[in-house]
Swiss-Prot record:
Name assigned to this protein: UDP-N-acetylmuramate--L-alanine ligase
Residues reported to bind ATP: 122-128
Function: Cell wall formation.
Catalytic activity: UDP-N-acetyl-alpha-D-muramate + L-alanine + ATP = UDP-N-acetyl-alpha-D-muramoyl-L-alanine + ADP + phosphate + H(+)
Family per record: Belongs to the MurCDEF family.
Listed EC numbers: 6.3.2.8
Record lineage: Bacteria, Bacillati, Actinomycetota, Actinomycetes, Mycobacteriales
Length: 482
């Protein structure tokens, strides 16, 4: 939207950890709105390369002198909540110089000032639902600004400064930062215990969603999935606040949108829905598999309709939705097996993705093979049993060691902690460099192979394809055979 200038403190910004999914999106919007941006990151990445091409000055590695990448220095330094330690030399130097240090969610909230804002949150499905909503609005004649935690297949980016008056964003609940926002339309996909390392208890985690809903702007609405017990309870509590609630799901009373049925078609699906006030069902065609994707699409439809998007154009937009990077993303095919990559790192996400894979593979008589990398020692310890049960949906399971991210190792917790609870055939492979060859050795033609997790397991897809091609060329058992 033209006519809204950047706040003075955001006109010259240095960003610590600029290559991350959330940070790079904010940087892109700042640049597109005429701001000057510098930054630093621990390593080169696609995000860093893309931002440099748009004019950002970026240094690899962290050093106090990076604050001088912009002539005259920055008006603010932006950082994230947990990934960047307070001892980072650039943050130390900023405080020494008296330069304000601002968290990313605060910056995003400032960038949304003056817009009609639609925000999506929940334990699972945030990125995909946000992306579906963006694509639906674009197809309906809107040009929304947006910031999302993944790369849209259609746009090839995670953020955009649009010409319209609408801003769509993903609201991350993991650190409570969603309380920086005041949405006009809020979508809550589900609520289930997670991020207990930050919140300390399930009750504290759940409470942040109540606080978020209380921040909905006057005249706004909550779109919420009542198939999920946690979200359904939130809807009931929200009724008492006088906020308009649009419920969606497959069962329940007073639903604004009902998922009647869905059926798998190739790697996509067709969902049949009924909207409140309409007698005849409608069909929603999707290129992504799984019942959970049908529910995400229904949420996007209801949210888009709230700001005037025509139903038919929204449905057409959803039919063209190509997915999000690292959400059941096809990496390639070799030796008759298809390799997908997925970000799932919570038991519920793991189960939903594997069940979606099951519907795809059952059409071809193959098997579901998953290489799963647990993410965070605290999450692994808390949900080891649940991870084991979810992974057991697959036919063959390979468990990697834990991706620590920001955490220190925890005694007695490893990938084996998860593998011990898997009832399907399972192998624990702690040596990362050996995983691709092992997966290829057990794969058969017709299989769907998934690399799964929020860490560097995403790097393995290409390696598995290479190993499968070698296996196929050598005529080893299993290659090219069902």
């Amino acid at each position: 939207m033209t006519g809204i200038s950047l706040p003075p403190e955001l006109q010259r910004v240095h960003m610590v950890g600029i290559g991350g999914a959330g940070m790079s999106g904010v940087a892109r919007i700042l640049l597109d709105r005429g701001g000057l941006v510098s930054g630093s990151d621990a390593k080169e990445s696609r995000g860093v390369v893309a931002l440099r091409a748009r004019g950002a000055e970026i240094r690899i590695g962290h050093d106090a002198s990076s604050l001088d990448l912009l002539p005259g220095g920055p008006t603010a330094v932006v950082t994230t909540h947990a990934a960047i330690p307070k001892t980072n030399p650039e943050l130390v130097e900023a405080r020494k110089r008296g330069i304000p240090v601002i968290l990313r969610p605060v910056v995003l909230a400032k960038l949304m000032t003056g817009y009609t804002t639609l925000m999506v949150t929940g334990t699972h499905g945030k990125t995909t639902t946000t992306s579906m909503l963006i694509v639906a609005l674009q197809h309906s004649g809107f040009d929304p600004s947006f910031a999302v935690g993944g790369e849209l297949g259609e746009a090839g980016t995670n953020a955009h400064h649009g010409s319209g008056t609408t801003f769509v964003a993903e609201a991350d609940e993991s650190d409570g930062s969603l309380l920086e926002y005041t949405p006009n339309v809020a979508v809550v996909t589900n609520i289930e215990a997670d991020h207990l390392d930050f919140f300390g208890s399930e009750q504290a985690y759940t409470a942040v969603f109540d606080s978020f809903v209380e921040r909905i702007a006057p005249g706004g609405a909550l779109v919420v999935c009542t198939d999920d017990p946690g979200a359904a309870a939130l809807a009931d509590r929200t009724d008492a606040l006088g906020i308009r609630v649009l419920r969606y799901g497959s069962t329940g009373d007073n639903l604004a949108g009902t998922l009647l049925s869905w059926e798998q078609q190739g790697t996509g699906a067709v969902a049949h829905i009924r909207l409140a006030g309409e007698h005849n069902p409608r069909a929603v065609r999707l290129s992504v598999p799984g019942r959970h994707m049908a529910l995400n699409a229904l949420a996007a439809l209801l949210a888009a309709r709230e700001i005037g998007a025509p139903t038919d154009s929204v449905l057409d937009g959803l039919a063209g939705f190509e997915g999000v990077r690292r959400r059941f993303e096809l990496v390639g095919t070799a030796a008759g097996a298809r390799v997908f990559d997925d970000y799932a790192h919570h038991p519920t996400e793991v189960r939903a993705t594997l069940e979606a894979a099951r519907t795809v593979v059952d059409q071809n008589g193959g098997r579901v093979v998953v290489a799963f990398q647990p993410h965070l020692y605290s999450r692994t310890a808390t949900f080891a049993h649940e991870f084991g049960a979810a992974l057991s949906v697959a036919d063959q399971v390979v468990v990697l060691d834990v991706y620590a991210a920001r955490e220190q190792p925890m005694a007695g917790v490893s990938g084996a902690t998860v593998a011990d609870h898997v009832t399907a055939p399972v192998t624990y492979v702690p040596d990362f460099s050996a995983v691709a060859a092992h997966v290829a050795s057990i794969a058969r033609s017709g299989d769907v192979i998934l690399t799964m997790g929020a860490g560097d397991v995403t790097m393995l897809g290409g390696e598995i394809l290479s190993e499968l091609r070698l296996k196929d060329n050598r005529g080893m058992p299993g290659a090219g055979a069902s």
